[in-house]
């Protein structure tokens, strides 16, 4: 409701924090040998999350002027081997918040490349700092700009629950195979021995 999105329970996969959300989302939309792009500076554990899928993390150099996307570099690196783009806004460690203009341009470029390459390219949006913005700024909701978005969230920061390990993946209802991705993540969870988050903590957050 907050973001005017038509999510249903079929589009939400509860996880043990944002780390669990990223691990499941990446496994759901990548295959071994694929490339996953992210933008410098980035959270160093992305290396582990992507590496465990068998995919390759490729880092787009930072735009140090304002830490928005360097689109010239991004377009060069957005090759047919890319299956996902991992973004983090508000960003850890820079604190930068991607503007609506940046997200629109990012989405348009990725949509064009999907058509050119003939396959889906997903955005995996890492959003644990979504509520931590200052000076009257707002963090635009990434999934509003691009259909093939999986939003990964943690309540650790927004509710000060870092030790309780509670988060989720929200699959955009208009995403390709949206109704299949949550069941897929459920099977991934079983395969890697990843336990569901505590029902007690889920009730507390609710």
State each model region's role.
Residues 84, 122-123, 150:
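Hydrophobic "anchor" residues on beta-strands that sit immediately upstream
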Residues 113-114, 121-122, 168, 188-189:
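Charged, low-complexity, helix-prone segments enriched in Lys/Glu/Asp/Gln
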Residues 148-206:
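Conserved core segment of the aminotransferase class I/II
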Residues 1-118, 130-145:
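Conserved core of the PLP fold type I
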Residues 39, 121, 194:
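Glycine- and other small-residue-rich loops at beta-strand/loop junctions that grip anionic moieties
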Residues 127:
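Walker B catalytic acidic pair
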